[in-house]
A protein has these predicted regions:
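Glycine-rich phosphate-binding active-site loops on the catalytic face of alpha/beta enzymes
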Residues: 79-93, 106, 159-170, 219-236
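Conserved N-terminal beta1-alpha1 strand-loop-helix module at the mouth
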Residues: 1-65, 96, 135, 152-157, ...
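C-terminal helical cap(s) of enzyme catalytic domains, especially alpha/beta-barrels
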Residues: 46, 50, 88-104, 173, ...
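Conserved anion-binding
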Residues: 67, 82-155
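Catalytic beta/alpha-barrel core
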Residues: 9-10, 29-38, 57-63, 79-87, ...
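Glycine-enriched alpha-helix->loop->beta-strand junction motifs that scaffold or abut catalytic
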Residues: 24-28, 74-79, 99-100, 153-158, ...
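Alpha-helix-loop-beta-strand connector modules within alpha/beta enzyme cores
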Residues: 40-74, 96-103, 126-131, 177-200
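Conserved, mostly hydrophobic/aromatic
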Residues: 8, 21, 32, 72, ...
Length: 242
């Protein structure tokens, strides 16, 4: 069993839910811009709430757009998760968009992350905090699986398997107990461990008994479920009485 970091996933633009999750003790919370209606204004409010409640606000991007990366980082996100990464070039572009010149291509602005321009906060962020931004990629396809070793050789913090998209790419959508899926997991885990990066898994269904099982496989970052599934499962409890 490896040391485990547990976070969760937020897809509803509701600050109270974000605060409840942070107060519950999740180490990090991923604000999902890919499969939700959350916009940049709402994302900034969620980032603020999560941050002030003592959890790390991460953002899953809707794609690979450098301008979106710039905006969520300026809003104060502590890390980003890039979906459907399949090539080294995509990874390098994501990393570059997170860093200021000369290390990258990110434009410099004065927003929440930079203390709204106050000199000491701005300088601290530019000189120190920007280097603490965590960068994660999602491996969700056969092409990403094929190139994962090269992808992981870049300067990233870790990866997350996108179980639904990966299983669909393996021609078994939503099935995570096939030989093909298990073999894909092994290949990705092995490549990540070689590079010394974190191994993440999004456990979509809120089944706490699966956490230790995933940890035993080698995953050390687990996103436990998502707000809509937690709400749906809990809402149905009175009607599932035996």
């Amino acid at each position: 069993m490896t040391k485990l970091s547990i976070g969760t996933w937020l897809s509803l633009p509701n600050e109270s839910i974000a605060e409840i999750f942070a107060n519950a003790g999740y180490e990090w919370i991923v604000i999902d811009l890919e499969h939700s209606s959350i916009g940049i204004n709402q994302a900034e409010q969620l980032i603020r709430v999560i941050d002030l409640a003592g959890s790390k606000p991460f953002v899953r991007l809707s794609g690979h757009d450098p301008s979106q990366i710039k905006r969520v980082l300026d809003a104060g996100a502590k890390g980003i998760l890039a979906p459907m990464i399949e090539t080294v070039h995509q990874t390098e572009s994501i990393i570059s968009a997170c860093q200021y010149p000369p290390d990258g291509t990110r434009g410099m602005g004065l927003a929440r992350a930079q203390g709204y321009g106050e000199n000491s906060a701005k300088n601290k962020y530019i000189n120190q905090k920007v280097n603490e931004i965590e960068i994660y990629v999602q491996i969700e396809s056969k092409k990403g699986l094929k190139n994962c070793k090269e992808i992981f050789s870049n300067n990233i913090n870790g990866y997350f398997i996108g179980p639904y998209d990966l299983s669909a790419s393996l021609n078994n959508p939503g099935k995570f107990d096939t030989d093909e899926f298990y073999n894909a997991e092994k290949i990705i885990l092995s490549a990540a461990k070689e590079e010394g990066i974190k191994c993440g898994y999004h456990l979509v269904e809120p089944d706490k008994d699966k956490i230790n099982e995933l940890n035993d496989k080698g995953y050390n970052m687990i996103a436990f479920s998502v707000d809509i599934r937690m709400l749906d499962v809990t809402a149905r409890l009175p009607f599932n009485l035996k």
